[in-house]
């Protein structure tokens, strides 16, 4: 493949991006996940849906991970300051507070990042441009302007915690879901993508 073609592919897929795991260490290149179906969510420890969404993310990773699903969580404090702890505090918050009861995520969590505005992680800028609005709620917007703490504000901004992006095994974003769309209800779309995977990803 020519260098120009490789560059074009990189710009149209998530494979050009990387992020540092919450546990530390070297950044993980999403290019290492070629052939996998990715479910990417911006998460928060103190949201009203934290327990529901985290447990459903764990459930999908446990059941569909062996078939090629990879769930990725990106903690973000831009929505109601609901991820206001330090990176090293997040896992304890999940374990002892919400969801609590010894909960441990079985999917990869990355370091805190911003998903909107000038300092947004490049992956989320790419995802928002590729899928400008949630498919289940195309008019989704931040409902209370006092919560907008980033600049510039764009029409394709993520509106709250736990928006979801589904990425196909070719690295191309397929569908965006609003915070109101339950994580577990994405399963049929994940199944459809898993059935299209190459036999040896």
UniProtKB/Swiss-Prot annotation:
The record marks 47 as: Subject to oxidation and hydroselenide loss to dehydroalanine. Catalyzes the reduction of hydroperoxides in a glutathione-dependent manner thus regulating cellular redox homeostasis. Can reduce small soluble hydroperoxides such as H2O2, cumene hydroperoxide and tert-butyl hydroperoxide, as well as several fatty acid-derived hydroperoxides. In platelets catalyzes the reduction of 12-hydroperoxyeicosatetraenoic acid, the primary product of the arachidonate 12-lipoxygenase pathway. The keyword ATP-binding does not apply. Its EC number is 1.11.1.9, 1.11.1.12. It is an enzyme of class 1 (oxidoreductase). Transmembrane segments: none annotated. It catalyses: 2 glutathione + H2O2 = glutathione disulfide + 2 H2O; a hydroperoxy polyunsaturated fatty acid + 2 glutathione = a hydroxy polyunsaturated fatty acid + glutathione disulfide + H2O; tert-butyl hydroperoxide + 2 glutathione = tert-butanol + glutathione disulfide + H2O; cumene hydroperoxide + 2 glutathione = 2-phenylpropan-2-ol + glutathione disulfide + H2O. PROSITE patterns: GLUTATHIONE_PEROXID_1, GLUTATHIONE_PEROXID_2, GLUTATHIONE_PEROXID_3. The modification N6-succinyllysine is found at residues 86, 112, 146. One of its GO terms (cellular component) is cytosol. During periods of oxidative stress, Sec-47 may react with a superoxide radical, irreversibly lose hydroselenide and be converted to dehydroalanine. Keywords: Acetylation, Cytoplasm, Lipid metabolism, Mitochondrion, Oxidoreductase, Peroxidase, Phosphoprotein, Selenocysteine. The keyword Cytoplasm applies. The modification Phosphoserine is found at residues 32, 195, 199. Belongs to the glutathione peroxidase family. The gene is Gpx1. It is found in: Cytoplasm; Mitochondrion. Homotetramer. Interacts with MIEN1. This is Glutathione peroxidase 1. The modification N6-acetyllysine is found at residues 86, 112, 119, 146. The lineage of its organism: Eukaryota, Metazoa, Chordata, Craniata, Vertebrata. Its main location: cytoplasm. Expressed in liver and lung. CDD domains: GSH_Peroxidase. The active site is at residue 47.
